[in-house]
């Protein structure tokens, strides 16, 4: 099970991200692509976690090498979902993916999304919000 203190930090971060997006004028009713970030020291370790996330219903990006402090390299990927900008839904995904990261000994590096212009194109069928979505992928 994920560390309760780290989960609480993520919950606080989630609310801060949502608050800042809404203060900046992002569309509160849009469907957002949520990018959860995972990293590991080697491809094989990350691949196991990515495959599990895919089986849970998430979309997974191609792994990339990323140079970090002091020239070290990690392998990273994003675990993607689409949902409303709802803290409880995102909290459920964060907890699920933090547990997965712990299981496979990879790092959960938080999540991000993009500003959604409320004056953007209308009529996009992808903006359907599923009222029954509890955030957890099965």
Curated annotation (Swiss-Prot):
Keywords assigned by UniProt, alphabetized: Cytoplasm
Record region (Disordered): 111-138
Cited InterPro entries: RraB, RraB-like_sf, RraB_dom
Localization per record: Cytoplasm
SUPFAM superfamilies from the UniProt entry: Hypothetical protein VC0424
GO terms assigned for molecular function: endoribonuclease inhibitor activity; enzyme binding
Pfam families: RraB
Chief place of localization: cytoplasm
Gene Ontology, cellular component aspect: cytoplasm
Biased composition (Acidic residues): 118-138
Family: Belongs to the RraB family.
HAMAP family linked to this entry: RraB (MF_01888)
Function noted in UniProt: Globally modulates RNA abundance by binding to RNase E (Rne) and regulating its endonucleolytic activity. Can modulate Rne action in a substrate-dependent manner by altering the composition of the degradosome.
Subunit annotation: Interacts with the C-terminal region of Rne.
Protein name, as recorded: Regulator of ribonuclease activity B
Lineage: Bacteria, Pseudomonadati, Pseudomonadota, Gammaproteobacteria, Enterobacterales
